[in-house]
């Protein structure tokens, strides 16, 4: 991901009938993104995503649910074996931008709701609305907007500074 050094994001590339697609739960466009040597796009509104050729692979642009500007990540490898996937997964346990604070995202009708950095964000085709939350309100948002069980929410540690 942009702004974070090293390899820090994993995506799934699939081949169907000789065509390659990106299927990425983090970007969450809800549709597969065709990957070709031309610029491609998929999704609409808050779910839109696009890819452009970059070096031997692609740069994928997406809408972050809590930030105004588009963000990107670069596809740097393909046909990665399971041993490499598991090793990268294990490395994120100690080195990830998501280890120090809570982040939740959910696609909803008309947009994306997100809880990040002590605020509730909602992105739709018109932009982003943001509501700062008191620490005591975060649990209620997780329960009401995201469907987290209360018994899980009460066990979450506070965000690190």
Predicted regions and their residues:
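Mixed-charge, low-complexity segments
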Residues: 1-6, 14-17, 27-161
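A glycine-rich helix N-cap at a beta->alpha junction
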Residues: 21-22
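Histidine-centered active-site/metal-ligand motif
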Residues: 9
